Amino acid sequence: MEDAGAAGPGPEPEPEPEPEPEPAPEPEPEPKPGAGTSEAFSRLWTDVMGILDGSLGNIDDLAQQYADYYNTCFSDVCERMEELRKRRVSQDLEVEKPDASPTSLQLRSQIEESLGFCSAVSTPEVERKNPLHKSNSEDSSVGKGDWKKKNKYFWQNFRKNQKGIMRQTSKGEDVGYVASEITMSDEERIQLMMMVKEKMITIEEALARLKEYEAQHRQSAALDPADWPDGSYPTFDGSSNCNSREQSDDETEESVKFKRLHKLVNSTRRVRKKLIRVEEMKKPSTEGGEEHVFENSPVLDERSALYSGVHKKPLFFDGSPEKPPEDDSDSLTTSPSSSSLDTWGAGRKLVKTFSKGESRGLIKPPKKMGTFFSYPEEEKAQKVSRSLTEGEMKKGLGSLSHGRTCSFGGFDLTNRSLHVGSNNSDPMGKEGDFVYKEVIKSPTASRISLGKKVKSVKETMRKRMSKKYSSSVSEQDSGLDGMPGSPPPSQPDPEHLDKPKLKAGGSVESLRSSLSGQSSMSGQTVSTTDSSTSNRESVKSEDGDDEEPPYRGPFCGRARVHTDFTPSPYDTDSLKLKKGDIIDIISKPPMGTWMGLLNNKVGTFKFIYVDVLSEDEEKPKRPTRRRRKGRPPQPKSVEDLLDRINLKEHMPTFLFNGYEDLDTFKLLEEEDLDELNIRDPEHRAVLLTAVELLQEYDSNSDQSGSQEKLLVDSQGLSGCSPRDSGCYESSENLENGKTRKASLLSAKSSTEPSLKSFSRNQLGNYPTLPLMKSGDALKQGQEEGRLGGGLAPDTSKSCDPPGVTGLNKNRRSLPVSICRSCETLEGPQTVDTWPRSHSLDDLQVEPGAEQDVPTEVTEPPPQIVPEVPQKTTASSTKAQPLEQDSAVDNALLLTQSKRFSEPQKLTTKKLEGSIAASGRGLSPPQCLPRNYDAQPPGAKHGLARTPLEGHRKGHEFEGTHHPLGTKEGVDAEQRMQPKIPSQPPPVPAKKSRERLANGLHPVPMGPSGALPSPDAPCLPVKRGSPASPTSPSDCPPALAPRPLSGQAPGSPPSTRPPPWLSELPENTSLQEHGVKLGPALTRKVSCARGVDLETLTENKLHAEGIDLTEEPYSDKHGRCGIPEALVQRYAEDLDQPERDVAANMDQIRVKQLRKQHRMAIPSGGLTEICRKPVSPGCISSVSDWLISIGLPMYAGTLSTAGFSTLSQVPSLSHTCLQEAGITEERHIRKLLSAARLFKLPPGPEAM
């Protein structure tokens, strides 16, 4: 269609005549195919002509139009058209004979090359038709035909070397290449290679082009032979030689004309007109030639048919399978136009336009012909064809004027270059050449009827081009710039095939820019660096970056639009801005027109319409999200942080002592607080917790809870208890949002000022439990702290702060709070330790040792503290005596109950009473009260011990707790707990652990130390039930024994608190229990248990020398491969549910990997964590076997004892294991049972 438009404008007519010369080369390469092609082409021509004739009128009309257009005599135009037609016929004949007359072919190709389009000009219409045909088959009837004609030239050169092959191909392609052999000539191949080299087309495209040409040529050859029988080819052959020379002259003329044309083309409009004039001048001869061809042979008949507008189509269809598509387009063309020549001219013009249009989608209305032709071909080789067609046409025009493509067969090279972008660049190049030539020629005949249409098209196109020229040309020019002027547009067209929009908008424009650009660029292979690129550019401009929707490169910032801006419809590069849009800035040129990505479109925008977002402003998104989850944004300054934790009174102290920024502040340690004379234990705990959270946030800024933990923790700390609110599950609580509610509930329920302050802070982000805990814990903690005099300072810290901390912790992350509590506890006296006893560790450890225990106390808080307590528990367990453990247990229970919820506070207190009564006598019973189901120490203990029981108890404990306290307490606790994620968040667990280590647990300790300790135990009871499974020591044994057991089991993990203690806080069972409990309780429990359990697990792993960051526990990608046997053993040793142990082990593993800056892929769930059981086939050593059964710490022991090979494993005995130094009965049993089982697989593996 564009061709038509282009032809109409004027440049096209010239190109059309020029295409005629190409036919000559076409004959050169493939005389017979030329004949067959001629016939096929004549059919195509007929179709085209029919279309053109039908819609555009007859040849006479076209000639008249040309005459009018060129201000020349009608008879001259007719003569010229006749000449062209004759030439074309002779060329067709020659095409048949060119094989026979290489000289003429060479001459033609040389002339064509020299003229660029000469060949096309002199080429008879038949040849034009052939190219058209090819074009159709490839690109579209007309578009491809034209460009094929151009290409034909090129191809002819190629075909010279590969005539036979080319012929076959030619037949398939029919005209553009039919003239030459199906195989490309060397020149054509060179062109293709050049195109590939210049990245105009890919190698694949070039190969595809070759194949397509061959296939089409073969078909065409088949057709041609059929045609030859008609005699059309022989006739052509006869006149072919003469025509060949004639063509040479004509080509020379045309080349001159085309050069002029090219210059004109450079000025798009003038070029067009001149092209048309040239076309007219050439066309008359072309038409004459074509008529001759028709007369001469059936091909002529076909041509006549073309003129008639019907005959050719059938032939075409019959002629070549590939042509049918062309035919379809042809038939479309044919029916509209009665004058085949006119049609052809129109077609050519259209082809030209069409090449563009075709490439783009044949949608341009002005290029109706092009569209018709284009569709069939378009489908076939829309991309290549179009790019070639358009590019080639443009190039052809440029080439003709430049004669630059001469080297490669006239247009072919240029076209090819242009079409390099397209897959079949050579064919396209030829076709493009043909298109141009045809356009040039056809305008002559086609000008008559086409003339009017062409004129209108021209005018329309001109207007469009002039309008769009700025935008489209700029786009296309950008394309042209990217590619040599015209080629880019042509290629864009191909690419735009799918985007008719661009084509329509820029088809003529493209032609023009192509022509103008091509005139200068045409010679340049139009390396068109990549028409595709330019296409893309233009497409982008026009279609809004369809090509590269999302820009994936680096951005140099972001900007928020503050003023709406709607760009001009002609400004395709500018982004449409709406207030509030966020633009990702790609570049900020100093001129002020920045480039950015908005709504998946890359474009430009003026910096004055936007406000650049600073990094901080951009980050709010995350914090906002977190806030939505109930997490406050990270504090931005020390002042902000102190304000959040309600300790602004210390601001001057920090600022005057060099703590001006958070980076310095997060290095704050307890000794520094002493130096700064900050003595208030609560304040110290809060500050240390805030520091921990800051550090955590930095190391783990992305882990959901850290930031919030910091804020919440800080807030909670400022509120009430320092760090004890280890209940907070940063990740889970935040995630579920239940935590928030829980904290709110707690805040509501807690009436204590400290609790209120804490809850106030906590409400926002922490679970209720922490709040309640903090209230209760504060009250109880204060009381208990008083009770534990020595502990008092720290205890109050531990106690009150624990409550607060717990809350904070729940909000932020239990571990931090707990850790601080532990640290604080460490500082605090025994009593302090006791409150921490909340944690299993605390319970186990003596009051003095209980410093850590408090951490455990914190841990008991189901929410998050549990995890921390576990850690604390580990350390405190060692330290604390069983007695203390029981006391701690009570304290823990108390603390936990407080933490669980303020409503629970009452409950906790009641529980405390009962637990204190029974629990004081027996710590285990207190744990049981946790379970509530079994208030009796024994019963409670048992419950705590069983993981399932623990879970049930956890639930029950919640219920129990509340029953002990009040329904309100229960409800509150349940509410709070549901708010807390049922499972402890992995991060929180880690954090808990760390916090425990830091001594965050002190909070619970204070409360547990005092009578309220029963209260604390209540909470611990909850936790205890879950806890009991957590710690191996938390065996269902007697309550009294439990502490011992706890210590004993604790001993292995050294940090493990006494059994009952473990049960209470440490018990992952709490976690487990938390899971089973309500969502809220589960979460709380899981948090508390998680903290405890994580600490216990980590300490146990450390004691056993198991490095989870190494194989087989973690592979090089950070995936988990913890053997199930190890998880099972730890679950037994820690008396915790396997699920919790597995989750904690994975958290530990991930944390350790991250500390090593290694990739860490957390695994989800027990099955995934243990999904890599060591298969017997993988066991190659005793060490591997021990790892597979979860007892890797005995590798050295067994090796020392002489068991160094797998063959010795089956012979292991109880005695030899004891002699080797393995004293743990369960481990010995495991080893023996595994050794017995190993007898089967070991055979091969035994070493």
Curated annotation (Swiss-Prot):
Entry's localization field: Cytoplasm
CDD domains the UniProt entry points to: SAM_SASH1_repeat1, SAM_SASH1_repeat2, SH3_SASH1
Provide the SAM domain boundaries. 633-697, 1177-1241
> Record's superkingdom?
Eukaryota
Cytoplasm in keyword set: yes
The residue ranges flagged as biased composition, category Acidic residues, are 13-28
Q: Which Pfam families match?
A: SAM_1, SAM_2, SH3_2, SPIDER
Output the InterPro entries linked to this UniProt entry. SAM (IPR001660), SAM-SH3_domain_protein (IPR051725), SAM/pointed_sf (IPR013761), SASH1_SAM_repeat1 (IPR037627), SASH1_SAM_repeat2 (IPR037630), SASH1_SH3 (IPR035720), SH3-like_dom_sf (IPR036028), SH3_domain (IPR001452)
Q: Which residues carry this modification: Phosphothreonine?
A: T858
Gene Ontology cellular component list = cytoplasm; cytosol; nucleoplasm; protein-containing complex
Annotated GO biological process: positive regulation of angiogenesis; positive regulation of endothelial cell migration; positive regulation of JUN kinase activity; positive regulation of lipopolysaccharide-mediated signaling pathway; positive regulation of non-canonical NF-kappaB signal transduction; positive regulation of p38MAPK cascade; protein polyubiquitination; regulation of epithelial cell migration
Molecular function (GO) terms listed?
G-protein alpha-subunit binding; mitogen-activated protein kinase kinase kinase binding; molecular adaptor activity; protein kinase binding
Phosphoserine PTM positions read: S90, S248, S407, S614, S821, S839
Q: Which UniProt keywords apply?
A: Cytoplasm, Disease variant, Hypotrichosis, Palmoplantar keratoderma, Phosphoprotein, Repeat, SH3 domain, Tumor suppressor
Reply yes or no: does the keyword Transmembrane apply.
no
| Domain SH3: residue ranges | 554-615
User: In which tissues has expression of this protein been reported?
Assistant: Expressed ubiquitously, with highest levels in lung, placenta, spleen and thymus. Down-regulated in the majority (74%) of breast tumors in comparison with corresponding normal breast epithelial tissues. Expressed in the epidermis, epidermal keratinocytes, dermal fibroblasts and melanocytes.
- Renumbered to this chain, region (Disordered) spans 1-39, 126-145, 221-257, 316-344, 449-573, 616-639, 713-810, 846-884, 903-946, 971-1065
| Compositionally biased spans, kind Pro residues | 1050-1060
Annotated Polar residues bias: 524-536, 746-765
Where are the compositionally biased (Basic residues) regions?
A: 622-631
Q: Which PROSITE patterns match?
A: SAM_DOMAIN, SH3
Q: Quote the subunit structure annotation.
A: Interacts with GNAS. Interacts with IQGAP1. Interacts with TRAF6 (via C-terminus); the interaction is LPS-dependent. Interacts with MAP3K7, CHUK and IKBKB.
Disease per record is: Dyschromatosis universalis hereditaria 1: A form of dyschromatosis universalis, an autosomal dominant pigmentary genodermatosis characterized by a mixture of hyperpigmented and hypopigmented macules distributed randomly over the body, that appear in infancy or early childhood. The trunk and extremities are the dominant sites of abnormal pigmentation. Facial lesions can be seen in 50% of affected individuals, but involvement of palms and soles is unusual. Abnormalities of hair and nails have also been reported.
What is the name of the protein in this document? SAM and SH3 domain-containing protein 1
Annotated source species: Homo sapiens
What lineage is this protein's organism placed in?
A: Eukaryota, Metazoa, Chordata, Craniata, Vertebrata
